[in-house]
Amino acid sequence: MLLPWLILIPFIGGFLCWQTERFGVKVPRWIALITMGLTLALSLQLWLQGGYSLTQSAGIPQWQSEFDMPWIPRFGISIHLAIDGLSLLMVVLTGLLGVLAVLCSWKEIEKYQGFFHLNLMWILGGVIGVFLAIDMFLFFFFWEMMLVPMYFLIALWGHKASDGKTRITAATKFFIYTQASGLVMLIAILALVFVHYNATGVWTFNYEELLNTPMSSGVEYLLMLGFFIAFAVKMPVVPLHGWLPDAHSQAPTAGSVDLAGILLKTAAYGLLRFSLPLFPNASAEFAPIAMWLGVIGIFYGAWMAFAQTDIKRLIAYTSVSHMGFVLIAIYTGSQLAYQGAVIQMIAHGLSAAGLFILCGQLYERIHTRDMRMMGGLWSKMKWLPALSLFFAVATLGMPGTGNFVGEFMILFGSFQVVPVITVISTFGLVFASVYSLAMLHRAYFGKAKSQIASQELPGMSLRELFMILLLVVLLVLLGFYPQPILDTSHSAIGNIQQWFVNSVTTTRP
């Protein structure tokens, strides 16, 4: 019975934030913080109940906790929520980054506090819904629902980019890309339900029943592409990434933390949970193309990151590069690579959130994100440059951080399946060190390039230090002791891999 509350608490909290703004600007902040704290506590409570590492019978999805209530029975639509090790880890990550998103916008957001927190809470509620929904209609409902508040977050509270583009442009671009891709997925979901109805005479949107839908290989390939396009836009996969750099560079800090830390993960989760098990043969056929797209993403993201002058755009392109590794892992069919992908998703969520929070703190002090205006900042403020150095080396996959474990497991698992692609993508790690260190050098070393950068700047407050040090501790912990994550995700990931590999060997009619 905890599952519906994981989704309801952020929605109710967001509504309260909006309505209590009249009692003072601090009230919505505290309500939002308590709301996300409660959501995180509930998800940790579910984790502590355990049972996630039990072995499962292959090919049958088994959930640790489930909630099912009829919604539109005539079409077989129900409010069907379920959690296993994979979705649990994503929900915990959402809760944690939700708390940090509220904290990092404590001083940054000054206008429409209540409405800001309404949008922030509803994005997080929608994301948790995506991770828990097992009814395809409900999944699509939450998938679309998290887009509208994100649009408002960028359009109303965004910053003007250093290249002069406006926040409205960025928000509209984000909305058009994601709406168009969502429409493609809706068509694919409806077509899948219709194919199932033709075969069985039963209308259903239930994921477990749709898993065994008999269909021809041509139909399966088309439907798989519908799902893949929707997830590829959100992930983002080159060449469908056009919305990401603009959305990141114009979004407020909380928006960037949510985008990089959580929203991109919904796409990787969608591929693992829906795309592979529903269309295993088509996915296996499409795998080489998807992996090469991942390789292109790794190099394109790295080169574009190196060329940026806006520090937030640089970090946005690093996300394109890192998610390329995850895409390669998803299509290998190797359990080791899958577990690496889960660790990489969590580590990237933490390290990207850290970098964006530090960017926000830097922007509050010098009021620019243009690295051509920085330089020489290392000696001008306490803590912030040194912590930026930590997150930069975490991003390039330094041993001892979670990013290294994730990338190593992905490359190790993929090498057995696609050695050529693995060897080529390894060079992407070299480029990662180039753009990470270039960012540090341009911003913190050398001579001060403007009046702003040459004056003494205030150090970090306790709130700012707490957020960043929490992320540092978690990343190092993940780097040295990833076992709890591996144990939790093991059976869920093993199940997806079994389904994918077994179905490929015993092809459909």
Swiss-Prot record:
Segments crossing the lipid bilayer: 1-21, 30-50, 83-103, 122-142, 174-194, 222-242, 259-279, 286-306, 314-334, 340-360, 383-403, 404-424, 426-446, 465-485
Entry EC number(s): 7.1.1.-
Catalytic activity field: a quinone + NADH + 5 H(+)(in) = a quinol + NAD(+) + 4 H(+)(out)
Keywords: Cell inner membrane, Cell membrane, Membrane, NAD, Quinone, Translocase, Transmembrane, Transmembrane helix, Ubiquinone
GO CC terms, sorted: membrane; NADH dehydrogenase complex; plasma membrane; respiratory chain complex I
Membrane topology type: Multi-pass membrane protein
Top-level taxon of origin: Bacteria
Residues in the Periplasmic compartment per record: 51-82, 143-173, 243-258, 307-313, 361-382, 425, 486-509
Membrane side Cytoplasmic: residue ranges: 22-29, 104-121, 195-221, 280-285, 335-339, 447-464
Compartments, as annotated in UniProt: Cell inner membrane
Any GO BP annotation: ATP synthesis coupled electron transport
Protein's job: NDH-1 shuttles electrons from NADH, via FMN and iron-sulfur (Fe-S) centers, to quinones in the respiratory chain. The immediate electron acceptor for the enzyme in this species is believed to be ubiquinone. Couples the redox reaction to proton translocation (for every two electrons transferred, four hydrogen ions are translocated across the cytoplasmic membrane), and thus conserves the redox energy in a proton gradient.
Subunit field text: Composed of 13 different subunits. Subunits NuoA, H, J, K, L, M, N constitute the membrane sector of the complex.
Similarity-based family: Belongs to the complex I subunit 4 family.
Identification of the protein by name: NADH-quinone oxidoreductase subunit M
Protein source organism: Escherichia coli (strain K12)
Gene name, Swiss-Prot/TrEMBL: nuoM
